[in-house]
Curated annotation (Swiss-Prot):
It comes from the Bacteria. GO terms for cellular component: cytosol. Its cofactor is FAD. Keywords: Cell cycle, Cell division, Cell shape, Cell wall biogenesis/degradation, Cytoplasm, FAD, Flavoprotein, NADP, Oxidoreductase, Peptidoglycan synthesis. It comes from Bacillus cereus (strain ATCC 10987 / NRS 248). This is UDP-N-acetylenolpyruvoylglucosamine reductase 1. The active site is at R174, S225 (proton donor), E295. SUPFAM superfamilies: FAD-binding/transporter-associated domain-like (SSF56176), Uridine diphospho-N-Acetylenolpyruvylglucosamine reductase, MurB, C-terminal domain (SSF56194). It is found in: Cytoplasm. Residues 29-196 form the FAD-binding PCMH-type domain. It holds the Pfam family MurB_C. InterPro entries: FAD-bd_PCMH (IPR016166), FAD-bd_PCMH-like_sf (IPR036318), FAD-bd_PCMH_sub1 (IPR016167), FAD-bd_PCMH_sub2 (IPR016169), MurB (IPR003170), MurB_C (IPR011601), MurB_C_sf (IPR036635), Oxid_FAD_bind_N (IPR006094).
Length: 301
């Protein structure tokens, strides 16, 4: 591991941090250390990192802004690549937008709305990066990334870089081809938006933000929606009907505001959250005969 660290530093891939606690990189403020954390300065840094990872046959994981993650208390084995700096470029040409995978999604939706571009209003309250949003087909307010993405530039596990079209991304509810079938890193996304009326777009954005502020516990560390909606039901409704609102294990609590959110009340461990998730799954299955599946990504040892 020491030799890999030295080569990463010599290759100038970006910041190289050893045994770096990941709690500071997730919105839930939970997570043990990464053996090696890389914050790349540019695409070339990511490519070189993957070359060295392959050379040393080391496991690797990519995270964005940590908004949809639950990281194990034991941390993550191998190399963790955190996207953000160096992948935050933006190019707007009429209604076509090309943006780096590390660009903050809320910042992007706000900026484009002020320019009178419609299509990203749904993302006004979704934390995280563009790359993470494309990876999981993030959505809200009856829309999602699949409605606006035309193509994405992907760095695959074998080091090759290629564009995937909308069809090749194989989007479905909160999923894409990148999650299992063709794992890779979203370096850049191209969106096709619509030219609209600025005041109306900004108004919708503000309405969406207000709704989230009034109904979701963003004043506490959390990872967003924990469970996927088991269509035709809503996960939050089922959890609340089961009487689990406010239920707490350790420092993790099912939010009083919204049943599909688990908040860190202070000092919560990943195990606290996992125990709550298991409780919810079993309770909903027993009471309603409905299988619950997590939307939050659970990673680590």
């Amino acid at each position: 591991m020491e030799q890999l660290v030295n080569e990463l530093i010599e290759a100038n891939v970006g910041r190289v941090l050893v045994d770096e606690p990941l709690a500071r990189y997730t919105t839930m403020k939970i997570g043990g250390p990464a053996d090696i954390l890389i914050v790349p300065k540019h695409v070339a840094g990511i490519e070189k990192t993957l070359q060295l990872v392959k050379k040393y046959k080391t496991k690797w994981t990519v995270i964005g802004r940590g908004s949809n993650l639950l990281v194990s208390d034991l941390g993550i084995e191998g190399v963790v690549i955190r996207l953000g700096e160096g992948l935050d470029h933006l190019e707007v040409e009429k209604h076509r937008v090309r943006v780096g995978g590390g660009y903050p999604l809320i910042k992007l939706s706000t900026l484009l709305s002020r320019q009178g571009l419609a299509g990203l209003e749904f993302a006004s309250g979704i934390p995280g990066s563009v790359g993470g949003a494309v990876y999981m087909n993030a959505g809200a307010h009856k829309s999602d990334i699949s409605n606006i993405l035309s193509k994405a530039l992907i760095l695959f596990e074998d080091g090759t870089i290629d564009w995937l079209t909308h069809e090749e991304m194989e989007f479905s509810y909160r999923t894409s081809v990148l999650q299992t079938k063709r794992p890779g890193i979203v370096l850049e996304a191209e969106f096709q938006l619509q030219i609209g009326e600025r005041e109306g777009i900004v108004s919708v954005m503000q309405k969406n933000k207000d709704y989230r502020r009034e109904t979701q516990p963003w004043n506490h560390p959390c990872a967003g929606s924990v469970f996927r909606n088991p269509i035709p039901y809503f996960a939050g409704d089922l959890i609340e009907k089961a009487g689990l609102r406010g239920y707490q294990i350790g420092g993790a609590q099912i939010s009083e505001m919204h049943g599909n959110f688990i908040i860190n009340t202070g000092g919560a461990s990943a195990q606290d959250v996992l125990s709550l998730i298991a409780l919810v799954k079993q309770t909903i299955k027993d009471k309603f005969s409905v299988e619950m599946h997590t939307e939050v990504e659970i990673i680590g040892r």
